[in-house]
């Protein structure tokens, strides 16, 4: 009896469109990745068209909302097929909460429904679809929508359910005084610029963009007259888009070469685990983790360029008078690669997710904000065991790094030479620490993670624990935190 024919590649294992399968076969790239890139490139051209031909001055806000939503829905269905139903169900459930829930509870209900649904989908990908390796990863858009749903719910709660004097300055600026219409809600969550790869953004900024007030609003915030402009300028995003597309192209080339040469599976092969020396393992781990970055640089920078091409993402004017289009930037590659502290690295990686975590968790929880923020970040990313190894290790490293900095940094500030030595040393330590910490994040499963850490003798865990145990830490109050509000600021001024 003849054996059942096997598919020629894994590229058919997708619920999205198979129209581009010949291109997938030609390039040797999985079909879901081809669909993603093609959708983002089409979105880029659509964004230019959207900005030029559907300008706010000549096109109503409703039309702009509708077009952005229709394109977004089409892209989601093209990439994910029937899996896109999960996205639409979550959006509709949370809009029902937006309409029916009281403003005092709207943020709680939205948060638990969105995070709960996302977690169920994460679990199904692991335990039903076996880590999702042979199926399209539909969780990406769901994660972005979850961020937007919860961000909007908290900002509506701030605007309608809290007193102005109880808000921080940032919460006051972003508070929403009127619940969005159904069209505005759909457009904010499903617009074609960010539905596939993000990033998350604030509802006020998005509505200002749709209504044509986004750039002027940002210029007024930075006081454009003091920047040397005699009339209100009209900055073009074209230069920023070209620059970001250049970064995208370089990232793609690195992904096709470096990432293929140093796959993460190298970290569990026989040579690495049993034969390589410890210094060789340190260096090789760093190289492999560096090689895993270009795909993130590519996806996030391209998503940023798409938003900019549509005219969204203007952040103001820098100190040199240059227009900045980094409001939605998700990373700062230079600061990542030159980071001299764990904190600096994290602040410049997945920036919009860090902003979301700060908005819905860190600034609001009364106890243990760092630990709870790490836990929320892990839950949002998924339920792969590797994520939890990364975030638990990250908590240890963060606390240890804080202790070292507080106890020793001031000794190196007396001269430029000492500061240079300190910066060089902390750069090397930071890069090695990040490589060690994030390796489980890309390995996903328990067995390869334990194998890697055993081969590294759990060195960073041990060092971090020793530092935490034996170096004096700044005393942390375990009583309820009091976030800085407009009321507390005004009270301090009058004291």
Curated annotation (Swiss-Prot):
Subcellular location: Endoplasmic reticulum membrane
Main localisation: endoplasmic reticulum
Enzyme class: transferase
Superkingdom assignment: Eukaryota
Regulation of protein activity: Partially inhibited by thimerosal.
Entry membrane topology: Multi-pass membrane protein
Pfam families: MBOAT
Residues in coiled coil: none
Enzyme Commission number, as recorded: 2.3.1.-, 2.3.1.23, 2.3.1.n7, 2.3.1.n6
Molecular function in Gene Ontology: 1-acylglycerol-3-phosphate O-acyltransferase activity; 1-acylglycerophosphocholine O-acyltransferase activity; 1-acylglycerophosphoethanolamine O-acyltransferase activity; 1-acylglycerophosphoserine O-acyltransferase activity; 2-acylglycerol-3-phosphate O-acyltransferase activity; acyltransferase activity
Pathway: Lipid metabolism; phospholipid metabolism
Keywords: Acyltransferase, Endoplasmic reticulum, Lipid biosynthesis, Lipid metabolism, Membrane, Phospholipid biosynthesis, Phospholipid metabolism, Phosphoprotein, Transferase, Transmembrane, Transmembrane helix
Catalytic site positions: 350, 381
Phosphoserine carried by residues: 488
Tissues in which the UniProt entry reports expression: Expressed in neutrophils.
GO terms, biological process: lipid modification; phosphatidylethanolamine acyl-chain remodeling; phosphatidylserine acyl-chain remodeling; phospholipid biosynthetic process; regulation of neuron projection development
Catalytic reactions on record: a 1-acyl-sn-glycero-3-phospho-L-serine + an acyl-CoA = a 1,2-diacyl-sn-glycero-3-phospho-L-serine + CoA; a 1-acyl-sn-glycero-3-phosphocholine + an acyl-CoA = a 1,2-diacyl-sn-glycero-3-phosphocholine + CoA; a 1-acyl-sn-glycero-3-phosphoethanolamine + an acyl-CoA = a 1,2-diacyl-sn-glycero-3-phosphoethanolamine + CoA; 1-(9Z-octadecenoyl)-sn-glycero-3-phospho-L-serine + (9Z)-octadecenoyl-CoA = 1,2-di-(9Z)-octadecenoyl-sn-glycero-3-phospho-L-serine + CoA
GO cellular component: endoplasmic reticulum membrane; membrane
Transmembrane segments: 34-54, 70-90, 126-146, 180-200, 238-258, 297-317, 371-391, 426-446, 450-470
Role description: Acyltransferase which catalyzes the transfer of an acyl group from an acyl-CoA towards a lysophospholipid producing a phospholipid and participates in the reacylation step of the phospholipid remodeling pathway also known as the Lands cycle. Acts on lysophosphatidylserine (1-acyl-2-hydroxy-sn-glycero-3-phospho-L-serine or LPS) and lysophosphatidylethanolamine (1-acyl-sn-glycero-3-phosphoethanolamine or LPE), and to a lesser extend lysophosphatidylcholine. Prefers oleoyl-CoA as the acyl donor and 1-oleoyl-LPE as acceptor. May play a role in neurite outgrowth during neuronal differentiation.
Family affiliation: Belongs to the membrane-bound acyltransferase family.
Name of this protein: Membrane-bound glycerophospholipid O-acyltransferase 1
Organism this protein belongs to: Homo sapiens (Human)
